[in-house]
């Protein structure tokens, strides 16, 4: 088994060594006989309600709640070990049988996907409640930037838009064979298909993002964790790209300040993950 560290839209995954602006080389796919960790440290600080995320600044604020989805791989199959919350130096499990957390929440609460639907966690009161009345097995969940509407990815790889406080869902027919979903800050919907290639959903249907490597593997998609007004964040073979609503893309080049902040992030991440790693596995 291995630990898969996908932090802040995979900013902790190093870029190609041939790129003079790449991040310092570190291997975040390390051997582990305990568990996999995916999607750690989603931001629920409330700083992103009306603006894009401002680089790495403050992402490891001690009092801000971060989330880590933990799983163990048995017989080649990933099994959920639950969602953990990290706050004020402490880690605790908040939901079993879940691997989906809404990233970059604009309020003091996070939405979690579970085998029996959607839950909401208030980071101030530290209370978990069922959200709405849906009972789908949710393996992916994202929240719109400008509203409380959600998009969910179900176990059968179908995407729905969820409205009316979790009581109504509408299938997104344009998205097919979906593996992962993401929104940009303009709430455009992107997804990775069965071929590990990203698509954007438009009024004319789903469009394949152009300008990316063919037969890409080890892909990741999310809202941009750096200050970019338009487009989504895509990682492919350790290279970062910005993918746009018009189905184009361009490689992202990290500046010196981002590389310095990256090193700080690595140190903070190691501290948090060591605590999660010491949580008991049944």
Show which residues each predicted segment covers:
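Structural motif
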Residues: 75-84, 116-122, 156-163, 195-202, ...
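Conserved beta-propeller blade signature
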Residues: 66-69, 109-112, 119, 149-152, ...
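Repeated scaffold domains used in trafficking and secretory/extracellular systems
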Residues: 51-61, 95-107, 135-147, 175-186, ...
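N-terminal, post-signal-peptide region of Sec/Tat-exported proteins
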Residues: 50-80
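Sequence/structural signature of beta-propeller modules
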Residues: 1-53, 262-282
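A short beta-strand motif characteristic of beta-propeller blades
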Residues: 43-49, 87-95, 126-133, 165-172, ...
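A generic tandem-repeat structural signature
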Residues: 84-169
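Hydrophilic extracytoplasmic domains
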Residues: 226-282
């Amino acid at each position: 088994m291995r630990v898969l560290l996908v932090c802040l839209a995979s900013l902790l995954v190093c870029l190609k060594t041939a790129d003079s602006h790449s991040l310092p080389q570190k291997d975040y796919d390390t051997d582990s006989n305990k568990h996999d960790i995916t999607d750690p440290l989603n931001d629920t600080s409330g700083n992103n309600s009306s603006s894009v995320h401002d680089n790495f600044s403050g992402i490891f604020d001690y009092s801000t709640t971060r989330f880590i989805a933990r799983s163990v791989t048995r017989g080649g199959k990933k099994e959920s070990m639950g969602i953990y919350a990290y706050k004020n130096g402490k880690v605790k499990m908040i939901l079993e049988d879940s691997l989906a957390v809404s990233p970059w929440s604009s309020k003091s609460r996070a939405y979690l996907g579970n085998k029996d639907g959607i839950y909401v966690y208030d980071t101030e009161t530290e209370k978990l409640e069922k959200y709405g009345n849906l009972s789908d097995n949710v393996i992916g969940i994202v929240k719109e930037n400008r509203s409380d509407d959600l998009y969910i990815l179900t176990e059968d790889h179908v995407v729905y838009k969820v409205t009316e406080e979790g009581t109504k869902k509408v299938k997104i027919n344009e998205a097919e064979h979906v593996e992962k979903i993401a929104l940009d800050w303009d709430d455009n919907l992107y997804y990775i298909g069965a071929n590990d290639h990203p698509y954007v959903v438009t009024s004319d249907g789903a469009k394949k993002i152009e300008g990316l490597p063919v037969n890409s593997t080890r892909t990741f998609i999310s809202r941009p964790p750096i200050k970019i007004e338009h487009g989504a964040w895509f990682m492919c073979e350790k290279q970062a790209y910005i993918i746009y609503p018009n189905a184009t893309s361009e490689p992202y080049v990290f500046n010196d300040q981002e590389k310095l902040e990256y090193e700080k992030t690595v140190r903070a991440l190691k501290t948090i993950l060591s605590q999660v790693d010491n949580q008991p596995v049944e």
